[in-house]
Each structure stands twice: as C-alpha cells, then as structure tokens.
A protein has these predicted regions:
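A generic structural signal for short coil/turn motifs at secondary-structure boundaries
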Residues: 41, 142-145
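Conserved N-terminal beta1-alpha1 strand-loop-helix module at the mouth
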Residues: 1-87, 92-95, 110, 123-130, ...
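Conserved beta-strand segments that form the floor/walls of ligand-binding pockets within enzyme
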Residues: 4, 113, 134-137, 172, ...
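Active-site/ligand-binding-proximal alpha/beta "capping" segment
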Residues: 139, 146-192, 198
C-alpha cells in the first residue's frame, strides 16, 4: 500500500506561506489546503483569490479540503484553479453527482469528507465514483486538536467498504496525526495522512514528514 503524507498549511505561518511550503515540499506528496468559510465551520482561512495564488505557486500538487457551504459552486472552482484533488464535505452538499462530475471534468480527483459523527454508509452510493474518502479524526474547523481514537473503527469500516479497491481510491485521515497516532491509523487502513501541527511545530518539518512516512510504512 502506497503511503502519502500531506502537510496541512493550516498550522503554517500564513505571512510566509511560500517559504513554509518550500520547507516540506521535497519530502511530501501533496500540500493540504484547508478552505474554511466561517459558515460550515466557525473559522476562516483563505478567500478564493488567495487560494488560487497558493495553488498556482505551489511546487507540488495541492489537495484542497473545502469546509464550506455550497460545495456545488466551490468544488469545481477549486478544480479550475489547478487543485490536483478537491475534497468536499458530505454534510454540506445536496448534489453529489453534479460535484463529482464537474470536478472530474476539470481534471482533478474528487474526495468526500465525513465529520466524526457521519457514518461511512452515507457515501455507499458514491464510492464507485470518487477518488478519496476523508475520515475526519477531529471536528473540522481548527488545527491542533487531539486525535479521536474512536474514529479508527470508522477507518476500518471505510477500508472494508472499498473492498478490493481496484480503482485505487485513497483513504485519508485528517486531525491529530503525529508520530504517536499515525501507526494506528495506518493499521486501520488509512493510506493518506494529513499532518499539520506535528509537521509545522517540529524543528525540522521535512524530517518530521519523513518520520511520519516511515512509521506509517512499518
């Protein structure tokens, strides 16, 4: 199983994002861009204009995680900006197939994210069409939260739901990922890991990305 580490810049210094991204790019698979609108979650990160600048200047592919209302509008826009992957929240959407179709039409991967309280079975009709499932292991909205170990069973259920996974759907976890939690998430079946605080609070962020990959691969 291929392991992917995607540092979240939610925990980086927004005043020098280019530098912060450069610190981890060579060791990372993607950069995780959290987009919050202060509506779906009680926090705000970047407007569309700033997000487009970040995506355009990023030296490695961008994984855009949309914690916003009306993902029917936002998801295709972020694909158009050049995101390699666009993930929207199941709880915010009503027209799932429209989102999936439009994001794919713009050449991006599409993922569905689930809050901790949302069961895996709500996306059973879409697993054959999406490219990633994101299991939130914290409540979305803020970085630096503690890993919710009770979500490991949900990761196992998601891995089981993917079956033989001939389409290569990624199973991502986001929230509280660190050297002390990534092994259990990997054992449960996750293959793609978002890490924010653990990476950007480390003395050497790139070395931390490498360490996380090593632990998850063991």
């Amino acid at each position: 199983m291929t392991i992917r580490i995607t540092p979240s810049i939610l925990n980086a210094d927004f005043a020098k994002l280019d530098e912060e991204i450069s610190r981890v790019a060579s060791a990372s698979d993607l950069i995780h861009l959290d987009i919050m609108d202060n509506k779906f979650v009680p926090n705000f990160t970047f407007d569309f204009e700033r997000a487009a600048e970040i995506i355009k200047s990023c030296p490695i592919p961008v994984d855009s995680h949309l914690m916003v209302v009306e993902p029917e509008k936002a998801a295709p826009a972020f694909a158009e900006m050049g995101s390699a992957s666009v993930t929207y929240h199941f709880e915010a959407a009503t027209e799932h197939r429209k989102i999936i179709r439009e994001v794919h039409s713009k050449g991006a991967r599409v993922g569905i994210a689930l809050k901790p309280g949302t069961p895996i079975d709500v996306i059973s009709d879409y697993i054959g069409e999406i490219d990633m499932i994101l299991v939130m292991t914290v409540e979305p909205g803020f970085g630096g939260q503690s890993f919710m170990s009770e979500m490991l069973e949900k990761v196992r259920v998601a891995r089981s739901a993917l079956g033989k996974n001939e389409r290569g759907v990624w199973l991502q976890v986001d929230g509280g990922i660190s050297p002390s939690t990534i092994a259990s998430a990997a054992e449960a079946g996750a293959d793609t890991f978002v890490a924010g605080s653990a990476v950007y609070k480390a003395e050497d962020p790139a070395a931390m990305v490498t360490l996380l990959r090593q632990i998850a691969t063991q």
